[in-house]
Each structure stands twice: as C-alpha cells, then as structure tokens.
A protein has these predicted regions:
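Buried, small/hydrophobic-residue-enriched core segments of structured protein domains
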Residues: 3-5, 9-224
Length: 224
C-alpha cells in the first residue's frame, strides 16, 4: 500500500536467538518428485500447498495439472510483494523450481500489468499480466482466466510469501518462517512494514502504534 512507510527503521526485528532443525538439501536437478514431497512433508511446509477446487491442503499422492502463484495482492492495505520480497529472488526462484517438480503441467505466475521489480525475471514459470481492481490479485480469479479447473481435475496454489519460505528450505536446509508484513489501517498511528516470524504475538507488533481510543471504542485487528 502506497501509504505504508518503507523506511528500514520501521521494520520490527525479533532479537531472540533462533535455533533450527537442519535438513539435507537435495539437488533439485537430480532429486525425484518423491524426494521433494518427502522433504516438504518432513519439514512441515507441505500445508502451504493448497488444492483447488475446495481450498484444502494438497494431497501429496495427486499430480496437479498445474500450479498457480499470484505475485501480487490487490486487497486494500495489502503489502507490496515487490518490496517485501526484494531480497528473496534466489528463494523465489528455487520455490518455482520445486513447484515444477510437483506438476506434470505448467507453473503459472501472475503479476500486475506493467509491474516493475523482480517477479517478471523469475524463470521456469509462465508469466501472466493482470490489470484491474480487487479481486484481480486473487489466485482463484487468475485460474479462471488462465486455465479453469474442469470436472475431475485439480490444480495447486501457493502463496508467494510461502513460496519464498519453501525455497529457503531447499537453499538453506532449514525452516525459517521469517516474513515481512504490512501493519496498516485507520487506527494505526504509523503504518509500516514489520519483519516477523510467523506466529509472533500481535501485541508485540502493535504495541505503541494504535491510536488512542475513547471509552466504548472497539478496535478490531484483522490478520489477512
């Protein structure tokens, strides 16, 4: 969102030391589909892959006709993925390489029309440009326009931030759930981007950044 401050000083950084379980990093060029699936299951990242229709966790025994990824979010106050993922080019590329191993068809990557940034430079995916207002960034809308799901077919989708986390697993051999989110809305004193670890306490992100409320006022905090 254009109203969200992008200063590096605005990014919340978790100070505690993190420890990680180490996983063997497979050679993607040589690894079998079964090895890829096994690592995603063992690491706990498999639920990031969602099946359409029905919007349920993908069945690892299925082979989808395609994988769809939306590289932008058209919802109000949504983060600018070109900004929050600006340091994740390598992980995004590896994530796409992983997705290619999981489908017998194509990996479809949807970007904003005339968008600048790194998304269009990613290789191994068929890129589609979309223009218009929300919900044009929703992957379901994009599937409908690119390659609709017919009776008996399944496709898989993965959120672009989750794709970077999957790529990070295959590049670094660990599950690092760090991501950047947008903190914004009418009751936020200073809209900003925050670097967090998934599962962070909401009060640690919002502390001191919610406008003073009058007695009887209620502030609703929404994630998503």
């Amino acid at each position: 969102d254009s109203s969200t401050s992008r200063g590096l000083g605005d990014v919340y950084k978790r100070q505690s030391v993190q420890s990680y379980e180490e996983f063997a990093k497979p050679d993607l060029q040589k690894a079998s589909r079964e090895e890829i699936v096994e690592l995603l299951l063992k690491s706990g990242l498999w639920p990031m892959i969602v099946q359409r229709p029905y919007g349920v966790i993908a069945d690892p025994n299925d082979t989808p006709k395609a994988v769809f990824i939306s590289a932008f979010d058209s919802a109000p106050l949504a983060p600018d993925y070109n900004y929050v993922l600006r340091a994740e080019q390598k992980n995004l590329q590896t994530g796409i390489d992983v997705m290619r191993k999981l489908t017998s068809g194509k990996v479809h990557l949807s970007v904003r029309a005339k968008a600048e940034g790194q998304m269009t430079a990613l290789k191994g995916a068929e890129t589609h440009a979309f223009a218009g207002k929300h919900p044009v960034g929703n992957v379901g809308v994009q599937i409908h326009h690119i390659d609709p799901v017919n009776k008996g077919e399944v496709v898989w989708t993965v959120n672009i931030q989750d794709l970077a986390i999957i790529g990070r697993l295959f590049n670094e051999g660990r599950v690092d759930m760090t991501k950047i989110i947008a903190v914004a809305g009418s009751e936020i004193e200073k809209p900003q981007y925050c670097r967090i670890i998934a599962g962070a306490k909401v009060d640690s992100i919002l502390k001191g950044n919610v406008k003073p409320q009058k007695e009887g006022d209620h502030v609703r905090i929404i994630s998503g």
